[in-house]
Amino acid sequence: MDETKEGSRGNAHPRAGDSDVYLLAAHPDWRESRVNKRLLAAARGVPGVTVNDLYAAYPDYAIDGPAEQERLAAARLVVLMHPIQWYSMPALQKLWVDDVLAYGWAYGPGGTALKGKDLWLVLTTGGQEEAYHPSGYNRYFFDAFLPPYEQTAVLCGMRFLPPLVMHGSHSASEQEVLDHVQTFAQRLGSYPDWPEIAELDAAPACEVPPSDRPDADDDADGVADVRHGMA
Ligand SMILES: Cc1cc2nc3c(=O)[nH]c(=O)nc-3n(C[C@H](O)[C@H](O)[C@H](O)COP(=O)(O)O)c2cc1C
């Protein structure tokens, strides 16, 4: 297999509406990937999953907001899959959030396009689980880095499903990587029949007051105000 091509194989611009799972895979350099590239290949083999390899789709960082919104609107589960970089998401994934989750569409007045959908994080880290501990070099439990993801979901009315995380991606054994990929594919393929889902509450309502917006008159047009940003 030509590993350099693995990440960008398939549709660079997937169509909306042919599945109810929309998976965004964001890896800045698939040639360097050990785990995410295998997760990506596994995701492509699961029926009903639309996969978007973000760095292949938008090498110029010019994200097609309306197309992304169409794919999101068609989905029931949105999956963000990426390596953790500087305790957060890769830059293009962050730009996608900035550009696509627009006021009046994803949140705020009339912003109900994502309400009732689920968000699932599939993350990898270089650091071992023990490093994410008050006595480790990352100083915090890994969960302490997740509230920005979780609150982004909740602000959009989405349920935040328990993330799937692989720590110590560089040092994990081959068998551990294979087992992880298998767990991931099994869960992706069996959504929404996950035991814990029935026990999750709907996202609590979060209203953004007009005073937190740059210009309240501009905003409530219900149209995707791509690139307006949050405040
Ligand atoms: C720019 C950059 C920043 C990174 N930041 C972190 C970090 O904050 N925490 C961590 O545990 N690993 C960090 N890593 C390591 C990656 O998370 C790790 O290489 C990746 O999860 C391995 O997955 P892959 O085999 O699919 O590339 C970073 C890597 C890069 C290149």
Say what each PLM segment does.
Residues 2, 11-52:
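N-terminal beta1-alpha1 ligand-phosphate binding loop
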Residues 22-24, 52, 79, 120-122, ...:
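Hydrophobic/aromatic beta-strand patches that form the interior of the parallel beta-sheet core
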Residues 34-45, 141-156:
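Short, solvent-exposed amphipathic alpha-helices that sit
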Residues 48-62:
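A short beta-strand-loop structural module common to alpha/beta enzyme folds
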Residues 58-66, 172-176:
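Structural motif
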Residues 66-150:
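Helix-loop-strand module that forms the ligand-binding subsite of alpha/beta enzymes
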